[in-house]
């Protein structure tokens, strides 16, 4: 529950899948993930910023990736759904796919139906995403080094990744009616300056830009990296998921005393 609790504020139009009601009644809906990360970032923003952003997007980018839209600190939409397999492209997970492609993959497997489903589940969780696109480890630094040497598959993998994140942020900008703040979190979001630069560079037509010196500075902790002329503030904020769990446990323990 803690992993997606923050997403309980999403409206029905964001959580409901267009599938028969019998499956929706059994729990088939969009739950969202990285809730602890989002909660920790909202908490840090409230503590550090004099004016809390009304319209905010959090891009949690790591081995798993999600983008979440928040209005006045409450989640209104997010890219992951029933499982953490969907949404934007990830290290070993594909993100959103045509459902027909999944049926195609099942039919391509040998063995009985259970074996076929198990094989496709493994493909979708461990053999897709950047790993599948590049044909090598999905680590961003490895891919960037390969791309710099002219590896076409690595170049394509990086382009598809940044494009998927850009599309999510751009779509949520429309949904929110504008964007006051973008926050990058997660292993890639916090430590990969080139990835941040590429993603924000794709958003220049929205008046969003970052300062190269601030983006490339070897710093830790919460920091602002947007350029002075940017219409949207851009931050890098550590995802304090462990601390958030500890705070929840402490609160539960106190309530039982």
Show the residue positions of the predicted features.
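Beta-strand segments within the central parallel beta-sheet cores of soluble alpha/beta enzyme folds
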Residues: 55-59, 118-126, 181-183
């Amino acid at each position: 529950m803690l992993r997606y609790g923050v997403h309980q504020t999403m409206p029905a139009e964001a959580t409901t899948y267009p599938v028969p009601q019998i499956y929706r009644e059994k729990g088939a809906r969009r739950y969202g993930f990285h809730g602890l990360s989002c909660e920790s970032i909202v908490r840090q923003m409230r503590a550090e910023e004099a004016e809390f952003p009304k319209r905010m997007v959090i891009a949690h980018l790591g081995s798993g990736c999600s983008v979440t839209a928040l209005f006045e600190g409450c989640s209104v939409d997010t890219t992951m759904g029933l499982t953490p397999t969907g949404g934007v492209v990830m290290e070993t997970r594909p993100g959103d796919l045509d459902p027909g492609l999944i049926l195609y993959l099942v039919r391509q497997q040998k063995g009985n139906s259970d074996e076929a489903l198990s094989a496709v589940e493994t493909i979708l969780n461990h053999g897709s995403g950047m790993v599948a696109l590049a044909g090598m480890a999905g680590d961003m630094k490895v891919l960037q080094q390969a791309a710099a040497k002219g590896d076409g598959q690595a170049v394509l993998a990086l382009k598809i990744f940044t494009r998927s994140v850009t599309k999510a942020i751009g779509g949520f900008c429309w949904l929110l009616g504008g964007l006051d703040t973008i926050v990058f979190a997660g292993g890639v979001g916090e430590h990969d300056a080139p990835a941040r630069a590429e993603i924000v560079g794709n958003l220049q037509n929205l008046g969003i830009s970052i300062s190269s010196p601030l983006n490339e500075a070897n710093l830790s902790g919460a920091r602002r990296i947007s350029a002075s002329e940017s219409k949207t503030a851009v931050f890098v904020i550590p995802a304090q998921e462990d601390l958030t769990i500890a705070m929840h446990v402490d609160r539960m323990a106190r309530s039982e005393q």
